[in-house]
């Protein structure tokens, strides 16, 4: 057969090449037919199948309600902005491929944002600290443990293992970035190849900052892992440049989208920060609590974190809308189903009782007054001798002022070692390195020498270093010395805490032997170490830590100043080189040339308020004032100096600014008006009058002979007038603020029918009337307020505002309001009304009188007359131009800190409209609080030209007298 075929082909003479051509023609025809079938006949079906369409619901964000003052001035509003969202909508062959893809997308977006000055914004509690180390931005406690539970995927904190619950920031980043987490960085056999990294747009190595930012993004994305097609917001309020760049690169950024959003904008006024608070991304525990009231809160919800924003959260928060969309496998929206659209509903608006113009002006008044007091106490010296033993005489050495610039981080000492540091900064750093080596040699000796001296035998400088290391660092900051493990009755512990009659080495060695040392904080081999090995590991850890500890470095600079190793002029010049001050201010050249001394320079800058008291955080550095409408209990001003710029805390939070506020020694986050409690001083004598007259131990005809020293108790209590006031009655006693008179009232109230005195009897009467006038409870004000404390010991001193009495300025303002109204005790309020977004009133907040003090009118008459006399006899109110009634108070702290100055009162005296409470912490005397009150009265009643009150410079008149 084969032969026949061959003969056939020979016969028809067809060439082999012809056969090949025929075969190729046949195959091509088949291929064309198949392509026609695929592209023309079934093309749409295959395209539809490839697109893998998915229908999903998409959230339409609502806007938050606005906040206004009592006059309709905008305090908190919303502005249009753009946010970046990330959605995991990909399909992957493996977990490794998934992590590479998501990390690559995250890295590309991160670099686009960073190149345009934008940043990632997620609720994450790990940051890079000043030393470039991973650190938590919250203290140990519930919030941090909840964060740990979220990172380790545990629904309950109690489910955390001991290791997880004690995890450091480093350990948590290692977990998240490693194989168990998001595989951002892998090592050894698991390491990514160069080809894998390149193909996914990732570099061969990542900085610590990059690892942190990628961890933030992946963590945020993981919170929606159970809802894969729900996007999370990873950056807010981004620039137009970032918007354009991301849209341009969107084909490479699967799951990334730009969405219209709104961001919060506050009035540019630091005085409003503590009242308004700020918004931020909700934490897990916050979401858990809020979802009990409204289950619709999303994982990336923005909520009120403090202040009115927090208190009114559920009212201000709008209701999100939604729509159904069809998307392809790349996340591109193909269709919007308008029939399913639910429109978002804006949050309700809130109107406050606050007058924002008063608030701002009073803030300025307090700042000017505090600066004036500070200036009057600064002297050209290195140190102050506290052996003078008189708080009223305390002076502030100029060297303390120079040091304060470093101690309170006005100057950033970590910048001294930067490559681009100025010549002055480099010189300071070179001197610091020499000092640091000397000190480390000494500390190493004290930790390792055979018989180091007891701490009490060291000089003051070394004592401060060693005390800082043990108490501030190892115990309070790092928790290496466990407070809970210490036996406080132990004799060795007592040696350390009382007179330091023990060396640091001996104390730490003993602590290790008693298991007071938490080895897990610095060693992974704790179970295998004896006490000597524990101590050696601790020593190594300590020296290494101190090299990076900014707070310890600040101590070294303090003593470098004292030793004149560095000068005040050098420190002041750095203010310019770090941008704290402008070189165009007219002082730079004079300071740099030496024609202006550092002393004169600082005095000038404090006077002009270019350097504020709060920045220095010396004493005084803070003050507060609260004004109420006596007819309603409305709070018209609630001022805490220093405040803060809440615009820098919302949207893309300025983390450096937040960290600065959190560590600022003037405590701007601590509301001085509603959270700071202190003894009321002689302002409390009005309550003592009510108690004494109501209980019948005195009346308006009772005269008591003030001899200058009340000796019926031990120790005797001196009147401020040590020569005595002689025979005086109640109105004079209030006017003169006679300690003796009110000591006698407290003593009489503690006597029984036989004249026997009982502390408890006297205190119970005081507590009864404190409760009547509302001093035993919070005021009802809608921001964070500390609980008051009515004195429960030292009965007789308690009647002159000492003992253990402690109240906030807001509580003293309610007290003043009750006095002004002859007994009406209001729940104070910051809220006027709520409206919807169209202005329709939903709720009006009405005055709430919680009690009326049941006292005869003649008692009130005596009190009002006495308080009127107080103001008439205080020169600080000379020329005020209206009748005011009030009571001064000076609360003693101790001989190492200036007294607090206070004033409570109301005006006009005959027909009160407003009540006021002013406190200047460490303000030396009540006279300084009176001067602030005088300025406030002049402003709110428009008694003089505003410019003469709000001068913009430190007040030039101060008071050294209290008379209370």
Model-derived features: where do they sit?
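Membrane-proximal periplasmic segments of bacterial cell-envelope enzymes
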Residues: 2-605, 615-624, 643, 746, ...
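Short, well-structured active-site flanking segments
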Residues: 647-649, 684, 693-712, 823-834
């Amino acid at each position: 057969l084969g032969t026949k075929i061959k003969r056939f082909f020979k016969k028809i003479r067809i060439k082999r090449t012809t056969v090949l051509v025929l075969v190729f023609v046949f195959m091509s025809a088949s291929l064309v037919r198949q392509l026609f079938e695929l592209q023309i006949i079934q093309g749409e079906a295959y395209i539809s199948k490839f697109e893998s369409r998915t229908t999903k619901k998409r959230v339409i964000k609502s806007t938050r309600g606005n906040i206004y003052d009592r006059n309709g001035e905008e305090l908190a509003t919303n502005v249009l902005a753009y946010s970046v969202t990330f959605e995991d909508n990909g399909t992957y062959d493996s977990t490794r491929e998934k992590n590479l893809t998501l990390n690559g997308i995250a890295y590309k977006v991160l670099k686009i944002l960073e190149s345009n000055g934008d940043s990632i914004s997620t609720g994450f509690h790990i940051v890079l600290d000043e030393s470039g180390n991973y650190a938590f931005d919250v203290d140990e406690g519930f919030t941090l443990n909840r964060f740990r539970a979220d990172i380790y995927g545990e629904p309950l904190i109690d489910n955390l293992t001991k290791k997880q619950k004690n995890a450091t920031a480093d350990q948590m980043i290692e977990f998240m970035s490693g194989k168990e987490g998001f595989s951002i960085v892998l090592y050894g056999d698991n390491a990514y190849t160069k080809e894998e990294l390149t193909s996914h747009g990732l570099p061969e190595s990542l900085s610590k900052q990059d690892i942190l930012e990628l961890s933030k993004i992946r963590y945020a994305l993981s919170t929606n892992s159970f809802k894969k097609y729900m996007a999370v917001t990873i950056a807010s309020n981004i620039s137009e440049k970032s918007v354009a760049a991301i849209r341009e690169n969107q084909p490479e950024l699967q799951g990334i989208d730009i969405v219209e959003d709104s961001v919060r904008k506050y009035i540019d006024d630091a005085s409003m920060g503590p009242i308004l608070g700020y918004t931020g991304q909700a934490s897990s525990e916050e979401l858990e609590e809020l979802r009990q009231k409204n289950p619709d809160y999303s994982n990336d919800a923005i909520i009120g974190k403090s202040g009115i924003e927090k208190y009114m959260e559920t009212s201000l928060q709008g209701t999100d809308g939604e729509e159904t969309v069809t998307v392809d496998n790349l996340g591109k929206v193909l269709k919007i189903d308008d029939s399913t659209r639910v429109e978002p509903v804006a949050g309700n608006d809130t109107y406050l009782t606050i007058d924002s113009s008063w608030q701002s002006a009073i803030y300025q008044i307090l700042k000017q007054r505090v600066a004036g007091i500070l200036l009057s106490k600064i002297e050209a010296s290195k140190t102050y001798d506290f052996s003078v033993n008189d708080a009223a005489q305390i002076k502030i050495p100029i060297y303390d002022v120079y040091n304060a610039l470093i101690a309170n981080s006005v100057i950033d000492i970590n910048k001294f070692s930067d490559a681009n540091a100025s010549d002055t900064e480099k010189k300071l750093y070179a001197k610091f390195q020499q000092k640091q080596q000397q000190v480390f040699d000494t500390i190493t000796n004290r930790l390792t020498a055979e018989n180091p001296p007891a701490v009490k035998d060291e000089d003051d400088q070394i004592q401060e270093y060693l005390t800082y290391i043990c108490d501030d660092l190892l115990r309070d900051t790092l928790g290496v010395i466990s407070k809970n493990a210490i036996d406080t009755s132990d004799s060795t512990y007592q040696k350390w805490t009382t007179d330091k009659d023990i060396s640091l080495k001996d104390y730490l060695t003993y602590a290790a032997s008693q298991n007071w040392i938490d080895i897990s904080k610095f060693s992974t081999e704790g179970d295998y170490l004896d006490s000597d090995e524990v101590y050696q590991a601790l020593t190594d850890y300590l020296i290494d830590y101190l090299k990076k500890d900014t707070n310890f470095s600040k101590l070294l600079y303090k003593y470098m100043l004292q030793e004149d190793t560095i000068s005040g002029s050098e420190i002041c010049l750095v203010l310019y080189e770090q941008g704290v001050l402008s070189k165009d201010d007219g002082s730079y050249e004079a300071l740099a040339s030496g024609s202006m001394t550092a002393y004169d320079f600082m005095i000038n800058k404090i006077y002009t308020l270019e350097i504020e008291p709060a920045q220095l955080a010396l004493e005084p550095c803070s003050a507060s004032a609260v004004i109420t409408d006596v007819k309603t209990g409305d709070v018209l001003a609630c001022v805490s100096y220093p405040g803060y710029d809440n615009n820098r805390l919302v949207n893309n939070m300025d983390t450096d600014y937040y960290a600065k506020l959190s560590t600022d020694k003037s405590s701007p986050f601590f509301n001085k008006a509603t959270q700071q409690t202190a003894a009321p001083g002689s302002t409390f004598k009005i309550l003592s009058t009510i108690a004494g007259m109501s209980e019948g131990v005195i009346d308006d005809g009772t005269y008591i002979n003030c001899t200058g020293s009340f000796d019926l108790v031990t120790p005797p209590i001196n009147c401020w007038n040590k020569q005595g006031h002689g025979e005086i009655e109640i109105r004079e006693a209030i006017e003169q603020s006679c300690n003796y008179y009110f000591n006698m009232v407290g003593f009489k109230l503690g006597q029984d029918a036989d004249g026997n005195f009982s502390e408890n009897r006297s205190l119970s009467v005081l507590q009864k009337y404190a409760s009547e006038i509302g001093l035993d409870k919070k005021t009802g004000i809608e921001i964070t307020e500390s609980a008051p404390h009515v004195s429960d010991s030292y009965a007789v001193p308690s009647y002159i505002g000492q003992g253990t009495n402690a109240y906030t300025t807001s509580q003293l303002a309610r007290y003043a309001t009750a006095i002004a109204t002859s007994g009406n005790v209001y729940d104070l309020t910051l809220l006027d009304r709520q409206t919807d977004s169209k202005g329709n009133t939903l709720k009006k907040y009405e005055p709430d009188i919680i009690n009326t003090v049941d006292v005869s009118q003649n008692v009130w008459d005596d009190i009002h007359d006495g308080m009127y006399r107080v103001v008439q006899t205080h020169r600080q109110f000379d020329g005020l131009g209206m009748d005011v009634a009030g009571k001064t108070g000076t609360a003693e702290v101790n001989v190492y800190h200036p007294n607090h100055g206070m004033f409570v009162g109301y005006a006009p005296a005959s027909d009160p409209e407003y009540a006021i409470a002013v406190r200047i912490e460490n303000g030396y005397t009540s006279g300084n609080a009176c001067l602030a009150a005088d300025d406030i009265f002049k402003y709110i009643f428009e008694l003089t030209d505003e410019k003469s009150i709000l001068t913009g410079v430190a007040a030039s008149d101060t008071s050294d007298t209290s008379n209370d």
